[in-house]
């Protein structure tokens, strides 16, 4: 990834296959290059963020699209949850026993009809179904749904909002910052 703080406009332009021009009689080309540098850096940053929430695995991407379509949940939200939960590691198992891409607890997985939480298709299907249930329960409030996904709906209800658990508060902030970017 290009580091715009240490990169000149001409080198940024060159990196994206664009031409760089200089002019001794006018600052307008320099200003245009600086504008382009900012635009290219912003574009690079946005592309970098988008790439961070791609699995790079066609079968996982396909499972995400299928679940998003089936449950009416934004694909970008599902990807942001997976990125936070497992870093797109289908074999991830937490210390608490949560498993797979969307880190389903065994009892939750079972209640969602997921027989193998380490199977990417089943995990994404079950995790998205659960995320949709939380979105419905909290009237589409993404932050509340994410808090419930992480800490359980009982805790969200008990505290009347995002629980005062540092882990849950950080979880919601991290996912929403990627999702709303």
From Swiss-Prot:
E.C. number: 3.2.1.17, 4.2.2.n1
One GO molecular-function entry: hydrolase activity
Keyword Hydrolase (UniProt): yes
Impact reported for residue 85 to Q: Lacks both muramidase and transglycosylase activities
Location in the cell: Secreted
A GO BP entry: peptidoglycan metabolic process
Thermoactivity: Optimum temperature is 37-40 degrees Celsius.
Induction note: Expressed by the motility sigma factor SigD.
Organism domain of life: Bacteria
PROSITE patterns xref list: TRANSGLYCOSYLASE
Coiled coil: none
pH dependence text: Optimum pH is 6.0-6.5.
Keywords: Cell wall biogenesis/degradation, Hydrolase, Lyase, Secreted
CC per GO annotation: extracellular region; membrane
InterPro entries with a match to the protein in the record: Lysozyme-like_dom_sf, Transglyc_AS, Transglycosylase_SLT_dom_1
Null allele phenotype: Mutants exhibit wild-type swimming motility in liquid, but they exhibit a severe defect in flagellum-dependent swarming motility. Mutants are not defective in flagellar assembly. They have a slight but statistically significant reduction in the number of flagellar hooks and basal bodies.
Family to which this protein belongs: Belongs to the transglycosylase Slt family.
Domain notes: The N-terminal domain is important for secretion and protein stability.
UniProt-recorded name of the protein: Bifunctional muramidase/lytic transglycosylase CwlQ
Organism this protein belongs to: Bacillus subtilis (strain 168)
Lineage: Bacteria, Bacillati, Bacillota, Bacilli, Bacillales
Gene name of the encoded protein: cwlQ
